[in-house]
Amino acid sequence: MGKKKRSASSSRWLNEHFKDPFVQKAHKQKLRSRAYFKLDEIQQTDRLFKPGMTVVDLGAAPGGWSQYVVSQIGGAGRIIACDILEMDPIVGVDFLQGDFRDEKVLAALLARVGEGKVDVVMSDMAPNFSGMPSVDIPRAMYLVELALDMCKQVLATKGSFVVKVFQGEGFDEYLREIRSLFSVVKVRKPEASRGRSREVYIVATGYKG
């Protein structure tokens, strides 16, 4: 039996991926992923991270965001990261592998955070996409709602939240909820984010607690 041919869409995605200048740049600089550059651009405009901060990273693998934040918060800072996928260790990152939707995993994550509050919650979580927006968008919205729930449990007053959201049904309501909880809310589309993608990043600062 011959090898199954790739679909036209998957072949196009692979072609785009390897030609992407940010993918090439990440490879050249030995970075975990192109997501590093998305967060770098957000940091240049919104200044979320400072030395000594404690940060929660949801959907952390392969580690692009954690890798970036380590460079910003330094040795006195702390990152608690979680993903359903494996992630190679990063110095300064306390990584928990497990499904964030599972109550036991959530409890373990909260235990690692401890009694203190965190300065930033960030989420780059995304579901496995089927290609059907009617299925994919609700799955994605469920994940970002969980990320916001995490903020309500662990984020310090005046803390910050950055979350990847896919535009579609439920986006406007979600944005309204975030606006009610934070003093300043921006919607960013970093240059490293592909133009065809529905993804945007909500950057919220000044958590009202």
Curated annotation (Swiss-Prot):
Keyword Cytoplasm applies: yes
Give GO MF terms, alphabetically: rRNA (uridine-2'-O-)-methyltransferase activity
Coiled-coil region(s):
none
Which residues does the UniProt record annotate as the domain TRAM? 191-209
Q: Which UniProt keywords apply?
A: Cytoplasm, Methyltransferase, rRNA processing, S-adenosyl-L-methionine, Transferase
* Organism domain of life: Bacteria
Its annotated compartments are: Cytoplasm
Q: What is this protein called?
A: Ribosomal RNA large subunit methyltransferase E
Q: What does this protein do?
A: Specifically methylates the uridine in position 2552 of 23S rRNA at the 2'-O position of the ribose in the fully assembled 50S ribosomal subunit.
Pfam annotation, one family: FtsJ
Q: What is its EC number?
A: 2.1.1.166
User: What does the record give as the active site?
Assistant: 164 (proton acceptor)
What family does the database annotate? Belongs to the class I-like SAM-binding methyltransferase superfamily. RNA methyltransferase RlmE family.
This entry carries the following GO cellular component terms, namely:
cytoplasm
Q: Give me the residues that bind S-adenosyl-L-methionine, please.
A: 63, 65, 83, 99, 124
Task: Describe the reaction catalysed, as an equation.
Answer: uridine(2552) in 23S rRNA + S-adenosyl-L-methionine = 2'-O-methyluridine(2552) in 23S rRNA + S-adenosyl-L-homocysteine + H(+)
Q: Which SUPFAM superfamilies match?
A: S-adenosyl-L-methionine-dependent methyltransferases
